[in-house]
Amino acid sequence: MVNIVVVGLQWGDEGKGKVVDWLSTNADAVVRFQGGNNAGHTIVINDKVYKLNLLPSSVLQNNKLSIIGNGVVLDPYALVSEIDNLKSSGINITTQNLAISESCPLVLSVHKQADILFEQLRQDTIGTTNKGIGPCYADKISRRAIRVCDLLDTKDLLYSKVNHLLIYHNLLRKSLNTPPIKAEDIVNELLNIAPKILPFVQPVWKTIYNLTQQNKTIIFEGAQGTFLDIDHGTYPFVTSSNTIASQAWVGCGINPSNKSYILGLVKAYTTRVGNGPFFTEQNNDIGKIMFKTGKELGTVSNRKRRCGWFDAVLARQAIMLSGVSGLVMTKLDVLDQFSEIKICVKYKYGDKTYDYLPASPHIQSNLEPIYEILPGWQTSTFGSVSYKDLPQNAILYIKKIEEILKVPIHLISTGPERNSMIILNNDFLQ
């Protein structure tokens, strides 16, 4: 089995957790390479629901190494809580099946408070999860972040680093008439949590290098989706990390000569959590049906996901950005009720049409979708595992999307359970 990079091609919530869990059955290791606990993956096994935020989806499999790469910003308390929750469900997390990069920046309480303060200052709120992700990445770029490796320092050295961090944050807080944070409080938080984190810490880049030298199979698990990418997304309504496939190499330290198969995920329709442009959004009964049938609530925020028709313009651009070779379509069954189904094939702005997403926020806010309309099938596909047994109009829809995107669909998910999967082509697994 080749190494596989799994990325979302929309605004996240494409079902990456389920697919990575399914793929990891035949893999040796799974790596998270960006984001933090602002991303959520939901996996259903034998009717039991597991919700993961920081841990790779492979933790639910036996004898798999789960790796948190340097591109992840790590909330140590959230991680320990997640580990404890899994242990209470009978999933044992040990130093044999979890590795954490020593270079991960740590999300601290000061970052979560800064997140809330910044959001209050904005004229147009982004819709952040208030998990402190953006401020932590900002500290990383500004070279003042506290990293996992700093937990190995003496108390005095750690205090010095925290004090340096708080020079910036307390200046910000002072300008907003907010009380300062004491370095002692942050240091004590870190010293309390360090013993629970440090046993898992190692030079992850070296661990991954050794795995590649042994021809082990690695899956790189993306979080969020292409159009939340800090550079390529619907800026400023984006996350604070790069979410496209190339981040997999940077976010864990694997060198680019290790070629991987890029597997892109799309829902059969489109959803988005939080604010920002959404070109095919359905603020009507159609959107309500998608929301209810798809159970579209954010795993982390529990916010309602906005719902709309499949946007082939976005998907096609995401395929180009990540070099996607094959697709997984999820939640096909959510479309079962509709008599007709629309696919956005272009955008219109004034008298101009676009076959890509312009970068300008002003233009984005005024784009109108141009649709191609297909007949619905109004027959249940829920839980289907056979392509030939799908309704003909469902097959027509699948083939139309392949035709527009010029990339084959390998897998189709028809329900939340691990094995609710139609396999069209598994050659990419060889």
Swiss-Prot record:
Gene Ontology CC terms: cytoplasm
PROSITE patterns in the record: ADENYLOSUCCIN_SYN_1, ADENYLOSUCCIN_SYN_2
Any single biological process term in GO: IMP metabolic process
Annotated GTP binding sites: 12-18, 40-42, 305, 331-333, 413-415
InterPro entries in alphabetical order: Adenylosuccin_syn_GTP-bd, Adenylosuccin_syn_Lys_AS, Adenylosuccinate_synth_dom1, Adenylosuccinate_synth_dom2, Adenylosuccinate_synth_dom3, Adenylosuccinate_synthetase, P-loop_NTPase
Cofactor: Mg(2+)
Gene designation per UniProt: purA
Name under which the protein is recorded: Adenylosuccinate synthetase
Highest rank taxon of the organism: Bacteria
Quaternary state and interactors: Homodimer.
Binding residue positions for Mg(2+): D13, G40
Role noted for this protein: Plays an important role in the de novo pathway of purine nucleotide biosynthesis. Catalyzes the first committed step in the biosynthesis of AMP from IMP.
GO terms for MF: adenylosuccinate synthase activity; GTP binding; magnesium ion binding
Organism: Ehrlichia chaffeensis (strain ATCC CRL-10679 / Arkansas)
